[in-house]
C-alpha cells in the first residue's frame, strides 16, 4: 500500500515524522519499497486575482494581475477561467517545478512574471480531482496570501510504499500502521473517531437473513439520510492514493474508510433497492459491474437485496444499485467475508479492485467495529439508523507465558530484559496479567507463544542482541569452512543469510531434482510455509531486494540447508559473466574432472545454463533460472557443499612445467546437434588446459564449429594423431 507521511503524522500529533521513519518501519519488520517526495514544486504562492483582461495584441492570451505575499504580479495565460476576486496559485519568477525555473518574459507587449498552475502542474493527477485540466480556482476562504501553499496543499509530503506480509493485512491502513509507530516511538496515538457514539435518529427497516456466514465473519448495515460532504483536503488525500473523488461524497467516504482502516465497505442508493431483506450467498450468472462492464461469474460471493444481486462481496458494486450525485438516502454495508471467496471473485471478474486486494486476506470483525465508529463520526450531522445485524466482539485469545521458552530463543535473556518491549506491546492492546497474555482482537496471526516472542523481539530491536559467533558444521564435515568463505570473499562475493522456509510458489523451484517440498504443519506466514529445494531461489529474493534499493551490481554467496537436510553452496551474481562465474567455481576444484551438460531440468534456462556432473553424478548447476518461472537477470552456481571438503577430491599433482601449445579443430554439427559429445571426446583423448570456441560457420542444414584447444605438447600430439588422421 502507498502512504502519505503527512496524513500518517496526523495520528501521531506529538512528533514530526521525517525520512528517518524508514528505519523505524524496517526495524518493525516492514520492507520499504520506495520513499520519495510527492511533488517537485518549489516556491508556489497563493494569489488573489486583482484584474483580468484580454491581451489586445493577441486573441489567445489573457493578462491576469495578482496580489501575492511577494507583492503584485502580472502573469499571462491562455486558460481563461479566472475572474476578479478568485483565489488561485502561481509560480513566481525564481520558483520551479520538475526542475524548470520560471523566468520573466514578455509576450505580445505585456510581461509575464511566472506561471499560473493547475492540479497537474503541482504534482496531482487532475483527472482524479476535476473534469478539466485548468488553472486551479480555490474557495476564497481556503487560505490567506501569507499561507505556505506547499503546506496547505500538502505538496511538501513524502509518499512511500510498504511490502506487507500476508499475516499483517491490517497494516495496509493508516490506523494500524500509526499504532505500530506510536508504540515504537512511545508517543501519543490520536484518533478523532475512536470514541464516536451512534446518534440514532430512526429504526432501519432493513434486515439481514441467512446463515451463509459463520461466527468468524460479519455483515452489518447502517442507514443514513442527508447530504454527505467530502473536504478538499480529503480529496487531495484520495488523489495521492490514485483514487477518483469526482463521485458522490458517500463513495469518497467508503474509500476513506478503506485507506484509514484497511477494510472495504460499500454504499447503496436506498431508492434503487426493491426489498428490505439482505443476504449473502454464491451466485452464477451475469452481472453489470460499475462502469457498465458485463461479466459472467461462477460461484461468486454476492450480496443480495431480496433475490437480486446488488454487489459482489468486498469486490465491486453493480450499476443497478450504485449511488449517484443526486442520492440522498444511503445504505452502508460494513462486513467481513471469507478471503478465499473474495479471491475467487477477483478471478471471476478478471480484475483486482482496491477492495478485493484487501479483502482477499483476512479482515477482522474488530475492523468492522472501527468502521462503525468512523461512520458515526463522519456522518454525525446526518440522520442515522441503528446498526443492522450488529454484534459483540469475541473475547481476546489467551496465551500462557513461558519464561523458559523466551530465554531459549533469546539466548538466555530473562523476561526482565524486555520490560520496555512489554510496555510497547501494551500500547498495541496486548494485555499481560497472571502469566497470561491477551492478544488484540485485530491480531489474528498471533496464536502461540512463539508469536509473542516475535513481537517482543521486534520492539526490543534485533540490533540490541549481542552477536554470537556462528559456527556451522554441515553434517559430518570437519574441514575448513572458514577458508572456503574467505576464498569467496576474496573473489568479491558477500555472504548472505536467507530463510530456509519459502512460500508455496518458490518451493516448486527444484533445479537439484530433490523431491516434493516439505510443508510445515505450523508456520508464521504463507511466505514461510515450505522448506526450500534450492538456495538459489532465496538468493534471488535477496538480489531483487538489492535492486529495489538501486544496488544493481550484486555478488552474493550462501552456504545452507535445503530439502532432505542437504547442505549446498550457492553463488549469485549480476556483475560477472557466465565464464567468469564458471571460473570462480572451477577454481575451487582444479583437480576434478567436472562435466557441464545441457540442462534437462525444466527450471533452468535452456540456452543459458548447464548441469554439473562428476562421474555421472549430478553435483549442481550453473546459469540462469528459466524466465518462465522467474524473470531475473542474474547468474547462479549451486553445488553440493561436501564436494569442497571430500578428501578423495584433494589429490595433489606435480605441476607440468612444459610450455603449453594449441591446436585448432573443426567439427561439423547438424543444426539441432549439441557440441557436448565432441567436448567429451576431446577430454577422453587428452588432458587439456582450455577449450575455446573461435568460429561458428552457419550452413543450410549444419554448421562448422572451430575449437582452439590448449594443452601440454604431449597432449596436443595425442589430439593431432586422433583427429587429424590422413
From Swiss-Prot:
Sequence ranges assigned to domain B5 in this UniProt record: 394-467
GO cellular component: phenylalanine-tRNA ligase complex
Gene Ontology molecular functions: ATP binding; magnesium ion binding; phenylalanine-tRNA ligase activity; tRNA binding
Any one GO biological process: phenylalanyl-tRNA aminoacylation
Protein name as catalogued: Phenylalanine--tRNA ligase beta subunit
NCBIfam families with a match to the protein in the record: PRK00629.5-4
Gene: pheT
Cofactor: binding details: Binds 2 magnesium ions per tetramer.
Subunit structure of this chain's protein: Tetramer of two alpha and two beta subunits.
Record: residues binding Mg(2+): 445, 451, 454-455
UniProtKB keywords: Aminoacyl-tRNA synthetase, ATP-binding, Cytoplasm, Ligase, Magnesium, Metal-binding, Nucleotide-binding, Protein biosynthesis, RNA-binding, tRNA-binding
Amino acid at each position: 500500500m502507498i502512504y502519505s507521511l503527512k496524513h500518517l503524522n496526523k495520528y501521531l500529533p506529538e512528533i514530526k515524522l521525517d525520512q528517518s521513519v524508514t528505519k523505524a518501519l524496517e526495524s518493525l519488520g516492514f520492507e520499504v519499497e520506495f520513499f520519495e517526495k510527492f511533488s517537485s514544486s518549489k516556491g508556489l504562492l497563493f494569489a488573489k486575482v486583482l484584474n483580468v483582461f484580454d491581451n489586445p495584441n493577441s486573441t489567445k492570451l489573457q493578462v491576469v494581475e495578482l496580489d501575492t505575499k511577494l507583492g503584485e504580479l502580472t502573469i499571462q495565460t491562455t486558460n481563461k477561467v479566472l475572474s476578479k476576486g478568485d483565489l488561485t496559485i502561481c509560480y513566481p519568477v525564481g520558483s520551479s517545478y520538475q526542475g524548470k525555473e520560471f523566468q520573466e518574459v514578455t509576450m505580445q507587449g505585456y510581461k509575464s512574471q511566472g506561471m499560473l498552475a493547475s492540479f497537474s502542474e503541482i504534482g496531482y493527477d487532475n483527472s482524479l480531482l476535476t473534469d478539466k485540466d485548468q488553472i486551479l480556482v480555490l474557495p476564497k476562504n481556503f487560505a490567506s496570501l501569507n499561507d505556505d501553499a506547499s503546506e496547505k496543499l500538502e505538496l511538501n509530503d513524502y509518499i512511500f510504499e510498504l511490502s506487507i506480509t500476508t499475516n499483517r493485512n491490517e497494516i495496509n491502513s493508516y490506523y494500524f500502521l500509526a499504532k505500530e509507530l506510536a508504540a515504537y516511538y512511545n508517543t501519543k496515538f490520536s484518533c478523532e473517531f475512536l470514541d464516536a457514539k451512534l446518534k440514532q435518529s430512526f429504526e432501519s427497516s432493513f434486515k439481514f437473513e441467512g446463515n451463509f456466514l459463520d461466527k468468524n465473519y460479519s455483515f452489518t448495515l447502517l442507514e443514513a439520510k442527508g447530504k454527505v460532504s467530502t473536504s478538499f483536503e480529503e480529496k487531495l488525500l484520495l488523489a495521492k492514493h490514485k483514487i477518483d473523488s469526482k463521485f458522490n461524497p458517500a463513495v469518497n467516504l467508503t474509500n476513506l474508510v478503506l485507506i484509514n482502516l484497511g477494510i472495504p465497505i460499500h454504499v447503496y442508493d436506498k431508492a434503487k433497492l426493491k426489498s428490505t431483506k439482505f443476504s449473502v450467498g454464491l451466485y452464477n450468472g451475469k452481472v453489470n459491474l460499475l462502469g457498465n462492464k458485463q461479466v459472467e461469474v461462477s460461484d461468486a460471493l454476492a450480496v443480495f437485496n431480496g433475490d437480486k444481486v446488488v454487489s459482489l462481496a468486498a469486490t465491486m458494486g453493480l450499476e443497478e444499485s450504485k449511488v449517484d450525485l443526486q442520492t440522498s438516502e444511503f445504505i452502508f454495508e460494513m462486513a467481513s467475508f471469507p478471503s478465499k471467496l473474495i479471491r475467487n471473485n477477483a478471478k471471476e471478474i478478471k480484475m483486482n479492485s482496491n477492495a478485493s486486494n484487501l479483502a482477499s486476506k483476512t479482515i477482522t470483525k474488530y475492523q468492522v467495529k472501527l468502521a462503525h465508529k468512523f461512520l458515526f463520526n463522519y456522518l454525525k450531522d446526518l440522520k442515522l439508523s441503528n446498526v443492522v445485524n450488529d454484534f459483540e466482539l469475541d473475547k481476546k485469545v489467551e496465551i500462557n507465558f513461558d519464561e523458559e521458552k523466551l530465554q531459549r530463543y533469546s539466548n538466555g535473556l530473562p523476561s526482565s530484559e524486555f520490560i520496555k518491549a512489554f510496555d510497547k506491546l501494551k500500547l498495541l492492546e496486548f494485555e499481560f496479567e497472571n502469566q497470561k497474555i491477551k492478544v488484540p482482537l485485530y491480531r489474528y496471526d498471533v496464536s502461540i507463544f512463539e508469536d509473542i516472542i516475535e513481537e517482543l523481539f521486534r520492539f526490543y530491536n534485533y540490533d540490541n542482541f549481542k552477536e554470537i559467533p556462528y559456527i556451522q558444521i554441515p553434517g559430518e564435515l570437519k574441514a575448513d569452512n572458514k577458508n572456503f568463505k574467505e576464498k569467496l570473499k576474496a573473489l568479491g562475493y558477500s555472504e548472505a543469510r536467507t530463510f530456509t522456509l519459502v512460500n508455496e510458489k518458490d518451493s516448486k523451484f527444484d533445479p537439484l531434482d530433490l523431491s516434493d517440498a516439505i510443508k510445515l504443519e505450523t508456520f508464521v506466514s504463507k511466505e514461510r510455509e515450505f522448506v526450500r529445494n534450492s538456495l538459489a531461489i532465496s538468493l534471488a529474493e535477496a538480489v531483487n531486494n538489492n535492486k529495489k534499493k538501486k544496488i544493481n551490481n550484486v555478488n552474493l554467496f550462501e552456504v545452507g540447508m535445503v530439502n532432505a537436510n542437504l547442505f549446498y553452496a550457492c553463488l549469485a551474481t549480476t556483475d560477472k559473466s557466465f565464464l567468469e562465474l564458471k571460473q570462480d567455481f572451477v577454481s575451487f576444484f582444479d583437480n576434478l574432472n567436472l562435466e557441464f551438460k545441457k540442462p534437462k531440468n525444466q527450471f533452468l534456462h535452456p540456452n543459458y545454463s548447464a548441469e554439473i556432473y562428476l562421474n555421472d553424478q549430478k553435483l549442481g548447476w550453473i546459469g540462469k533460472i528459466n524466465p518462465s518461472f522467474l524473470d531475473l537477470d542474474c547468474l547462479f552456481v549451486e553445488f553440493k557443499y561436501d564436494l569442497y571438503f571430500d578428501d578423495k577430491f584433494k589429490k595433489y599433482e606435480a605441476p607440468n612445467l612444459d610450455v603449453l601449445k594449441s591446436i585448432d579443430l573443426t567439427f561439423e554439427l547438424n543444426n539441432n546437434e549439441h557440441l557436448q559429445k565432441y567436448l567429451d571426446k576431446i577430454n577422453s583423448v587428452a588432458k587439456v588446459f582450455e577449450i575455446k570456441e573461435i568460429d561458428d560457420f552457419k550452413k543450410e542444414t549444419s554448421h562448422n564449429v572451430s575449437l582452439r584447444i590448449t594443452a601440454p605438447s604431449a597432449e596436443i600430439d595425442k589430439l593431432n594423431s586422433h583427429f587429424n588422421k590422413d
